[in-house]
Amino acid sequence: MTRTEPGTAPQAGARLDRETIVFVCVVAALTVLRLVGQHFSVVDLDIEEAQYWDWSQHLAFGYFSKPPLIAWINAASGLVCGSTEECIRAPAPLFYFGASLLVFLAAKELYDSRTGLWAGLACMLAPGVSFSARIMTTDVPLLFFWALALLAYVKLMRGGSWRWAIVLALAFGLGLNAKYAMAYFLLGVLLAGLVSGDARRLLKRPVLWLALFGGILMLTPNILWNAQNHFATAGATADYVHKALTFEEPLEFLAAQFGVAGPIVFGTLLVLFAFFGSRNLNGDDRAMLAFAAPPLVVIVANGVWSGAANANWAAPALISAFIVTAAVLVRAGMWRTLAAGLAFGAIAQGLLLVGDTVADRLTVPGLGDNADIYQRVLGWDDLGEDVGRLAVTSGAAAVAVERRWEESALNYYLRGKLPVYIWSGSPQPTNHFDMVYPLAADGPQPILFVTLCDKAARFDGVFDRVTDLGSLEVDSGPTSSRRYSAFLLSGARRPLGGPPVCPN
């Protein structure tokens, strides 16, 4: 590899124009393809997506487990095209179009347009992005605003004006309101200042700190909401406490990153971390590595400490990873390696597009109970139809369940036809629905209770009248299904505690 000094001038204008046009055309076409794929998808809303939709029906400055931006986005998309699965998910491909464009622009500013092209395409075709672009979760706006904040930071590092500080403040603030993981950006700023001369000089500019402080101020309404709600969001992380040191979860997390970022990007990133002090890396390379390091290090450490390390928790690390890995591989002239990375991503994208259209017919032999690989996101629409029909015929005034999964799904797929409550056994709320839809003895009755337990005897002494309505079974794939029992309950005795344990 040959060393390139920071601030190397971009290539000729014709090349810039050509590569910019190629990039925009490719990502625009892929965005349209993803939107078309959503139209033909047979996949139901995931429980998280359905929960975020419920939030959008009750706009606030905070919710049990997340800041509020995802709800506002869902509400906005609902005003445009309604509340179908396709419409709820439509913003995701658009946000990733924007994120990839921002990665392209940041890489072009730091290096050149060719690096920008490869970095932007690596972002757009990363398997994790292709997966995430099919669903509407908090990672979608988070990565967009992280990329925007990084572009503004790079512009300021290159001596940009106060206008870029305003962009940084807005991006950082909106990112915090998308997901608290945006706070890793602060660690990236500090770490970059230790390893890059340009980044160190930027730390001395008041405009940077004013921008970051302005972004933090944008989280004030959410902080006040948490204070008024007994810091419910902090309580949502109570499960992630120290149990016993383990290395299994962090190792699985690191292995998963090869699938999330792609084997070329993440493999190259690990090599760059290993040779961080190499003379072949310049200050800009190290600054980008500095932004990638905090999420990865924190999540690995948390995995060792608590045994919790989900594959998507370090997603912000990938934004600068796309840039620095592309820069190093372009400088080394490793075109086949770059192309192989994009080819891997394109194959993953194609499989997801096809899989979503045949999800209800897709099964993979040899995986045992997990052969129906879409079973987590199938059958919920059918459950909503069956429960709604049974509620009408039985004369139920409300529906109740005892798990978050069914509460989230029925709340969306019943579309307000009946109130849906959760009968939780926890003395303190453990999720959003525990907090806002708890089953109470003085609520509407009779109650259609949908449960995995088929024993009517469990309600003895809790309800005066119990009617066994039989079972409900919905397919969750070609070889799998979910089976529930339904009971009509009335005459609740007070106080109504948690649901009795299912008898053997």
Model-inferred region functions:
Residues 38-52, 61-73, 82-87, 379:
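Extracytoplasmic catalytic/substrate-binding loops of multi-pass membrane glycan-assembly enzymes
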Residues 90-111, 148-149:
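Transmembrane-helix motifs of polytopic, lipid-linked glycan transferases
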Residues 108-114, 149-164:
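Membrane-interface transmembrane helices that cradle and orient dolichyl/undecaprenyl
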Residues 119-120, 152, 164-179, 214-216:
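Membrane-interface alpha helices of multi-pass inner-membrane proteins
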Residues 128-142:
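Short acidic/glycine- and proline-prone juxtamembrane loop motifs at membrane-interface regions
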Residues 185-285, 291, 295-303:
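Transmembrane-lumen/periplasm boundary regions of multi-pass, lipid-linked membrane glycan transferases
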